[in-house]
Amino acid sequence: MDLGICKRCGEFEGSCECGKGEVLLKSEDRKKVSKFLSGLLRHFGRDFGVRLDEDGWAELRDVLKILSERYGVGRKHVELIVKFDPKGRFELKNGRIRAKYGHSVEVRTDWSEGGEIPEKLYHATSPENLNSILKTGLLPMRRREVHMCSSPQEAIEVGKRHSSNPVLLEIDAKGLMQDGIEVRRKGKVYTVDFVPPKFIRVLSFDPRSPNPAKGY
């Protein structure tokens, strides 16, 4: 959806109520900028001269310089992207910006925004990975943490980036924590260093059902 600002309605996503707001980022441009910003803060910042500290923070001015040259956007555009990001991927604070999760570069990941952790979480994977996961557990692979979602629908949506028919897994988050494994909340995503096989259950998924996730 578009992002913009209105003197009457304030910042908005999609359209403002009065219909007189100014669109600052069209939907297509928003996708391009947020995708590049995500990569910059998670994977390839060094290639553009952006330095991340041990907690993943970068100086906002350095990021804005690159985004301005590449896409012609400024601070307000970035603020809107951060505010309305559907998964809460980014954080702005004291003139710095970071991605909360998803890094392939080395940053400290043992922090959490706190709050209640659901007893059950969900992760979707390609069918060809299933046997290995059930034997050895869920590993971060190319990322530094395993990512989990609070709903089956969200997990399937993420899983479809890698497979047209992902397998849905239910994670016993309560069991993980009782076993001393820390589960962290970062934005709308939950992360963990590793999920042992005993905390994983394979689910079927029917989005048309009022109870779409069923174990088997």
UniProtKB/Swiss-Prot annotation:
E.C. code: 2.7.1.-
Gene3D superfamilies: 3.20.170.30, RNA 2'-phosphotransferase, Tpt1/KptA family, N-terminal domain
Keyword NAD annotated: yes
GO BP annotation list: tRNA splicing, via endonucleolytic cleavage and ligation
GO molecular function, one term: NAD+ poly-ADP-ribosyltransferase activity
Domain of life, source organism: Archaea
Keywords per UniProt: NAD, Transferase
SUPFAM superfamilies reported in the protein's UniProt record: ADP-ribosylation
Disulfide bonds: none
Family: Belongs to the KptA/TPT1 family.
Role this protein plays: Removes the 2'-phosphate from RNA via an intermediate in which the phosphate is ADP-ribosylated by NAD followed by a presumed transesterification to release the RNA and generate ADP-ribose 1''-2''-cyclic phosphate (APPR>P). May function as an ADP-ribosylase.
Protein name, as recorded: Probable RNA 2'-phosphotransferase 2
Gene responsible for this protein: kptA2
